[in-house]
Amino acid sequence: HGFAACDGGDKDRIRLMEAANLGIVTAYNDMLSAHQPYRDYPDKIKTAARELACTAQVAGGVPAMCDGVTQGMPGMELSLFSRDVIAQATAVALSHQMFDAVVCLGICDKIVPGLLIGALHFGHLPMMFLPAGPMPSGLPNSEKARVRQLYAEGKVGRAELLEEMPPYQGGGEMIERVSFERTTWN
């Protein structure tokens, strides 16, 4: 079962143990903007592995939450606990003894330690943590500071302040178009 879903070339390489097989553990989800680059990473990693005559498989996904999204909500109580769940999910993903190395995809002070703790259950495997890079806010800091200062002085209202923090990198039903320059709303 460990390679049944692979395409023909990868399936044969894994079955015959002809090449290294990388396990990918990902924290990608559609909700967290910082994770949006990870959507395409598994396919890119698989392509790069094939170019090196190796294979790569997504071993599993781990839950990912953001304190910024759950602040003031009951879910915030789960933030630190999530690290242990992520560690367990990572260990389960790697437990099939199919992999020669592991690539962990995740960002956050709970997610990365959870990935590390789980991957260390298989400490014999070389592991790599691949960051998605900095999370730009879509507005320059000078513009954010300007709007916040005007709000503090009472010169702009709540609506203008909220415009300073539009969603970015990904969208939802309420968003018409997102770019790093501007977000337009439905």
For each feature predicted by the language model, list its residue ranges.
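Glycine-rich phosphate/diphosphate-binding loops and the adjacent beta-loop-alpha structural elements
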Residues: 20-33, 175-185
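Flexible, glycine/charged-enriched surface loops at secondary-structure junctions
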Residues: 12-16, 53-61, 158-162
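Glycine-rich oxoanion-binding loops at beta->alpha junctions
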Residues: 1-10, 55-104
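Glycine-rich phosphate/diphosphate-binding loop of Rossmann-like nucleotide-binding domains
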Residues: 12, 29-58, 66
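Gly/Ser/Thr-rich loops at beta-strand to alpha-helix junctions
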Residues: 28-35, 63, 106-113
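Residues at the starts of beta-strands that form the adenosine-phosphate
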Residues: 21, 55, 126
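An N-terminal, well-structured beta->alpha segment
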Residues: 1-20, 34-37
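Active-site cavity-forming subdomains of large catalytic enzyme subunits
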Residues: 76-186
